[in-house]
Amino acid sequence: MGCAMSAEERAALARSKQIEKNLKEDGLQAAKDIKLLLLGAGESGKSTIVKQMKIIHESGFTAEDFKQYRPVVYSNTIQSLVAILRAMPNLGISFCNNERETDAKMVFDVIQRMEDTEPFSEELLAAMKRLWADSGVQECFGRSNEYQLNDSAKYFLDDLDRLGAKDYQPTEQDILRTRVKTTGIVEVHFSFKNLNFKLFDVGGQRSERKKWIHCFEDVTAIIFCVAMSEYDQVLHEDETTNRMQESLKLFDSICNNKWFTDTSIILFLNKKDLFEEKIKKSPLTICFPEYAGAQEYGEAAAYIQAQFEAKNKSTTKEIYCHMTCATDTNNIQFVFDAVTDVIIANNLRGCGLY
């Protein structure tokens, strides 16, 4: 006797196959929509990563962007010099030449008049160059871990002639080096490897953290940024707390959060270039008194990585770690390519498609 299906059964089977097909398509679509959350303490390089995504995966900066960053470069440069000048008496450092007092007054006056976003006058530019060349100012700069100073200070102050030119226009690297405190949430959309990325950058300072909470839903992966070079520095918001210890505490709370049980965690140990320079002269024991290794990049970097990985209490969750230099476009392009491959594999696995 035959097993012919009734019209109803055929329709039910067709519906079932269509539902299966739809579910698979939905799964594939879900695997294509990637939501990334950039986390990390203040000044760990998150905003620079966002800028790099614009360069690498969008069309880069617009003419309007270049124009808007010009006053930011002026301000970052003069504010960095002022931070050094203000730190000098606190550290008991004097100018090599007393005439620099007059130059310093000119710089302070510009800040007081809130003209730090204006192009440098010839007199101001000359004063800034004399100050930056002063051995007392250089000595104070060499102790910048003892006060708050932008990472980009040397980059800009070493290039005062270019920045002070009448026809100065910021370069891509200038924009990457600028520092503007992130408040609220910055969102960037781009496509890469047939995936649709939404990248969220949230303010890293303590006062901003409460705003992260509603970004957490449906996150595919977290990129957690740590400034490796800040092992001997304290927080802006609390000058008794070591910056790297704060990052470790924050990483612990994110990595082991019940909301992120199934979320890939990617650790960017950032500012490797600054760390490589600093580790030669500033001991890692400032942050990790128990460290007994060499004061050299490879061993010290591996130790820092191990400290972060040790915070992971899960036996199933893997931490994907990369040493990065957020201002180096080639480095970030290479790292993000590797990160994307991990996300694709994990995401397809999560959808039962891998």
Swiss-Prot record:
GO terms of biological process kind: adenylate cyclase-modulating G protein-coupled receptor signaling pathway
G4 motif: annotated segments: 266-273
Region (G5 motif): 324-329
Chain positions recorded as GTP binding sites: 40-47, 176-182, 201-205, 270-273, 326
Residues annotated as binding Mg(2+): S47, T182
Domain G-alpha: 32-354
Region of interest: G3 motif: 197-206
Region (G1 motif): 35-48
One Pfam family linked to the record: G-alpha
UniProt-annotated stretches for the region G2 motif: 174-182
Lipid-bearing positions (S-palmitoyl cysteine): C3
Keyword field: GTP-binding, Lipoprotein, Magnesium, Metal-binding, Myristate, Nucleotide-binding, Palmitate, Transducer
Lipid modification (N-myristoyl glycine), residues: G2
SUPFAM superfamilies: P-loop containing nucleoside triphosphate hydrolases (SSF52540), Transducin (alpha subunit), insertion domain (SSF47895)
Family, as annotated: Belongs to the G-alpha family. G(i/o/t/z) subfamily.
Role noted for this protein: Guanine nucleotide-binding proteins (G proteins) are involved as modulators or transducers in various transmembrane signaling systems. The G(o) protein function is not clear.
Assembly and oligomerization: G proteins are composed of 3 units; alpha, beta and gamma. The alpha chain contains the guanine nucleotide binding site.
Name by which UniProt lists this protein: Guanine nucleotide-binding protein G(o) subunit alpha
Species per Swiss-Prot/TrEMBL record: Locusta migratoria
